[in-house]
């Protein structure tokens, strides 16, 4: 069955219009742009990284937290986990195929490759023709500890 990724991405963007802080192609921050540009690509080689949607919201105390969102429009492409339940990004193909894995890849690039941001939120969105899934993952340090919330 073909992917409906673009349609799902547009639905997600429509929901985020209230935030007025999201983008796909524009810069949200030079340091984050450099981190995404210089990190290994989702395929494992060199090249830039392009999250489907980027947010840069501020907390009540005006602390900004980068949010990377990856959308997949093929049913069953939300997340790939290891037998222990952790997100499995050991294979580039899993980073490319699964929404959460791709979003975590981007969040990881920010946490590892910036001085200012040691936490990031990864969001995977997956919807097939008749089902919808969303997963948030909070990245908080370079040791790759994460906490997932359905």
Which residues make up each language-model segment?
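A short, conserved, highly charged catalytic patch centered on acidic carboxylates
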Residues: 1-121, 125-142
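Extended, non-transmembrane interaction/recognition domains
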Residues: 99, 147-150
């Amino acid at each position: 069955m073909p992917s409906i990724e673009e349609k799902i991405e547009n639905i997600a963007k429509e929901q985020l219009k209230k935030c007025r802080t999201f983008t796909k192609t524009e810069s949200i921050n030079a340091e984050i742009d450099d981190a995404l540009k210089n990190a290994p690509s989702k395929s494992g080689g060199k090249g830039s990284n392009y999250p489907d949607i980027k947010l840069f919201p501020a907390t009540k105390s005006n602390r900004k937290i980068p949010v990377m969102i990856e959308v997949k429009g093929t049913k069953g492409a939300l997340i790939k986990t290891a037998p222990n339940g952790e997100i499995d990004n050991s294979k580039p193909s899993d980073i490319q195929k699964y929404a959460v894995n791709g979003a975590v890849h981007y969040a990881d690039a920010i946490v590892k490759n910036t001085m200012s941001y040691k936490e990031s939120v990864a969001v995977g969105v997956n919807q097939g023709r008749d089902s919808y899934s969303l997963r948030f993952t909070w990245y908080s340090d370079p040791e790759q500890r994460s906490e997932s919330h359905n």
